[in-house]
Amino acid sequence: MSGVSAGTVDRVLHNRGDVSVSSREKVQKVLDEIDYHPNMFAIGLAAKKHYHIVCIIPYYIEHEYWYAVAAGIDRAAQELRPFNVGVSYLYYRHADKSSYKEACAVLREENADAVLVAPNFREETIKLTAYLEEADIPYAFIDFNIEQTHALCYIGQDSKTSGYIAAKILMRSYEKGQELVLFLNNQKNNPAEIQMQRRLEGFMQYLSEEHKDLIIHDIVLHKEDTDGNRRMLDAFFKEHPQAVLGAVFNSRVYQVANYLHEKGQKLAGLVGYDLLHKNTEFLKTGEVTFLIGQRPGLQGYCGVKTLCNHVVFKRPVTAVKYMPIDILMKENIDFYFEFE
């Protein structure tokens, strides 16, 4: 078609050897006409280089949030093994700054071609990303985005929009005279708290638009103080019997649900986040009305695949990949799965 030899076409395709300008133009014209694109998977299979992707995530236990993230990462790793891509983990304790710093320090000793980070502790993450950028190592974030960095991609949920939706579905249960209670977190200065604040912003935006006169209370729950939480909730519900709508902005809606279960009572509506086993059990029994899912397994899977597309297959990637905002209730939870 181009009127040149097969050897010339091969040299143009693989950008090697000397080719005259006129011959190169002839070959390129035909390539454009047939919309030629190189088979990057074949190139990856043929490549002799081995690639190493390091994933920094919190320690986890079975059936919890980060367990699902790791399952997605493992699935991507299995699919990419034929392309000489290896995936390894560095773990840290979720609320422990020194543990996170240690994982970041160990990374510097790894021969990483790309890094997937579940960021925690903003300053330490910024120091980590400064090192990665200086070393020209691409990195992506999952679960939480730190905008001051130059991450290749963020994969996770739009927290503010999810909060807006949480309010919208919860208020479907509203009847005149009812009051709302927000169950908040006592942890400060970590990404989980910032993520909760963004959800709360979206939640309050909907209420300001549609329910300006709603009476709203808030209670701060403590992760490790079950007895203190129980006394606080006893006093609150005794004083505010009309507070029959509730919202939890982290994954621990089971704390409130367990209290309600022990008391043999249910709210008119209670919304929370994440499909932890404890949360879904209370969804099925009715103490929790709605759960917002953020597909942690898909986050891990897409994080590794995105880095591989960039590093191995040289494909362009989008800077932000938002996860679907899944709304689960007892009627559909048994039919839910992230991906197959």
Protein language model regions, located:
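N-terminal helix-turn-helix DNA-binding module of bacterial transcription factors
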Residues: M1-A47
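Hinge/cleft segment of the Venus flytrap/periplasmic-binding protein
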Residues: V30, I34, P191, L207, ...
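Amphipathic helical "hinge" segments at domain boundaries
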Residues: N39-S98
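Hydrophobic alpha-helical
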Residues: A114-E133, H217-K278
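Flexible loop/hinge segments that line or gate small-molecule binding clefts
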Residues: E124-T161, L276-K284
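Hydrophobic alpha-helical segments within soluble ligand-binding/sensing domains
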Residues: Y154-V181, N229, R295-V312
